[in-house]
Amino acid sequence: MRIAQITDTHMRARGELWKGRVDPAATLARLVAALNRIGPDLVVHTGDVADSADREDGAPQYAVAADILSGLKAPLRLLPGNHDTRAGLGAAFGRPGDGFLGFSEEARGLRLVGLDTLEPGRTGGRLCADRLKLLEAVPRGGPVLIFMHHPPCPMGLPFMDGFPFEGGAALARAIAGREVLRIACGHVHADVERHWAGTLVSAAPAASAQLPVDLPAFAESPRGLPAGFTVEPLRIRLHDWDGATLTVKTVMVEAVEGPYPFPP
């Protein structure tokens, strides 16, 4: 069972650049082509599908994202990020309603749980008692892989850690005594991991751009903005489950040299 994770596509209207540099539609199209070459059994998008649905009409952004993602050969699961809206995401991807957009399903003995951490008006995420019911309903005793947009703890990134997560202690209690193999996140625009609450919290690299890991804290940044971002070759996080062990790989899917043969 191979589960591919993508995150933070920050879709704009077709032809519109993100931060004047990145074409999200073209980037997502390349990402879909790469995913179809890899052939995962499932794709999970861990949020910020749109770039500014939280501040303006996100329908054009979601329409572009839905059109491109419809080209995926594998089934798709989506979670909202802080730049998304539940209504917009649900309408574009066939999940109408005002409820939380989580999921819980079994795949070859591995329980996959997607938690909705969106809290409108907040950059940081939140898990409330209602959202945690999805996880608490999972029978104990089997392995669990959790997906969510926001990491539930500081990740050692001064800028992004300045937007705190609400509900981390409750999540830690909910996973206590469970075999939670990993909490797979996005949000921070960096490839970074941290041991927390007896498991590993892992943020995947963004599909749009990366933030330097040593950016100063929000309060110390001019105008409250990071000094800059980098546009890097696309990477995809792969979670491979063989029925007993989870192996996680980050693969670069474009602009690499080689492979070169080893000299004799």
Predicted stretch roles:
Residues 8, 47-48, 81, 149, ...:
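Active-site glycine-centered loops adjacent to acidic/histidine catalytic or metal-binding residues
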Residues 59-136, 170-180, 194-197, 209, ...:
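Extended active-site neighborhood of metal-dependent phosphoesterases/phosphodiesterases
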Residues 31-42, 124-202, 235-238, 242, ...:
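His/acidic metal-ligating clusters that form di-metal
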Residues 1-13, 109-119, 145-148, 199-205, ...:
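Active-site-proximal beta-strand elements of phosphoester/diester hydrolases
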Residues 1-60:
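N-terminal active-site segment of His-dependent metallophosphoesterases
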Residues 203-264:
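Acidic, His/Gly-rich catalytic cores of divalent-metal-dependent hydrolytic chemistry
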Residues 5, 45, 78-80, 146, ...:
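Structural beta-sheet core signal
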Residues 14-18, 50-53, 117-127, 153-162:
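Surface-exposed cleft-lining segments at the edges of enzyme active sites
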